[in-house]
Amino acid sequence: MKNKSVSLVFWVSLVICTIFVAFGAIFPKQLEKLTQNITSFIALHFSWYYLLLVLVILFVCVYILFSRYASITLGEEGEDPEFSLPSWFAMLFSAGMGIGLVFWTTAEPISHAFKLTPIHKAGTQSAINDAMRFSFFHWGIHAWAVYGIVALVFAYFSFHKGYPGLVSATLTPLLGEKAMRGPLGGAIDVLAVIATVTGVAATLGFGALQINEGLHFLFNVPSNFTMQVILIVIATILFTWSAWSGIDKGIKTLSNINMLLAFVVLIGLFIVGPTLYILNTFTNGLGNYIANFFSMSLRIPSGGQKFQWLQNWTIFYWAWWISWAPFVGIFIARVSKGRTIKEFILGVLFVPAVVCFIFFAVFGASAIYLQDNHIADIAKAATETATFATLQHYPLGFVLSLITLLVIMIFFVTSADSATYVLGMLSSSGDINPKSFVKVSWGIIMALFAIIMIYTGGTQAIQNLLIIAALPFSVVIIAMIWSLLKSLSEEKPRNSNKVLIKHRDPDVLEYRSSKHIDEN
């Protein structure tokens, strides 16, 4: 795409985002009502679509993993990976889950077990068992399949095929170069930008709410909209500086530090918390997750509170992962250059998912233990304070809470930092080194988006906007998968003794041994 087209993508996206921010600032109640009505319509009519789409995406990832294409290098043949395995995993984890994991790791299991439950009566052992398996389900390989397939598409076309790092460029084999360089390609890139801004702004909104509640819980700092705006402004300055410093200096360093701090809290709570209960909960949850894998993947209640639960949780999560897919996908692709498709899928699909399971088992089980044994009423705590309310009842709770707060702050920066880089790429003809002023512009827009989300309804408004933004981009993801499979099917078999020859039927391509051809 030419520079002029890229500028148009940038300005069109910027105008759309600005209109949304202005509308939300002037008419917050109307925006809240509008997004709620649209969300209800989507949940009622498209829940089946979200569930089937994410499951099909997972099947596609598994198919490619065991196909003949698995040995293809995402880069030049023989190229070494840019980052070591530990650094790679740290960046996957920090950018891919970030604040959301810390935000929900305690609140979600407690909610499933003692509030709005998916199946069984609240507070029963069956509800507690459901809590962990559904938490694993929402944060497991389904989520990482969505990230992984989009990341694989970008990595394959950018590093193996040499295409620009744009969503539209990945559809060239499907729709043609001319179409992708025209208005259609520009519209697709605008959709990707809007989805990314929405997805990351939602994360910033969650982060601001939890940081504010954490400061209030620990230090009695006022918890209000003004303080949340101040936190977003401070964070914007920090992640803008990080984005300015470059991906290697900024994101890699912060990701490594945060992975270490997150595991300090994890191991600390595992030791001082109900260790045996945590181990039993993890094992039981994993078994239930595997045993009910497909029933959870395709489950749609007939109505009432159970359907409301589906909308509030599964549909919300699937939409969140789809909204985050262009951002996380491009970033994962960027840091995965030089790895084979097999190594890539195994790493992206399974390693972070297992880490998420462990986090949910430790934090979620620790909270459930307090609630189930009537030691503390964690279920009454606000979503944003559930983690801090849990930690305070265990030894070293204040210290662990402080570290947790720091982890959230760093996740805040790394998520937004990565997003400014990706948005800069999408606005700079796929340039892997976008100009700093472009990244700063997107940083400011994401901050304003997050502020408006909080202003118009807090957590619920964030969830509604995610579900809305994900629907149009999900169609683009389907096209990206189709384009990838089409291009892979045209790959020459990885056998140096075979060459492509012209078949008698001009529409048929045939590979034969070069030795056989020479002999004939």
Language-model features: locations:
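N-terminal alpha-helical transmembrane segments of multi-pass membrane transport
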Residues: 1-127, 267, 481-490, 514-519
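Membrane-water interface regions at transmembrane-helix termini and the short interhelical loops
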Residues: 1-4, 28-42, 61-80, 132-137, ...
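Helix-loop-helix module between adjacent transmembrane segments
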Residues: 2-4, 8-11, 15-25, 58-63, ...
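Hydrophobic alpha-helical segments of multi-pass membrane transport proteins
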Residues: 16, 49-66, 262-273, 355-365, ...
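Flexible loop linkers connecting adjacent transmembrane helices
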Residues: 34-39, 66-85, 110-134, 156-183, ...
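Membrane-interface alpha-helices at helix entry/exit sites of multi-pass transporters
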Residues: 48, 85, 123-131, 179-190, ...
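Membrane-embedded translocation segments of transport machinery
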Residues: 180-182, 192-339, 346, 351-402, ...
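Long, low-complexity, intrinsically disordered cytosolic termini of multi-pass membrane proteins
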Residues: 498-520
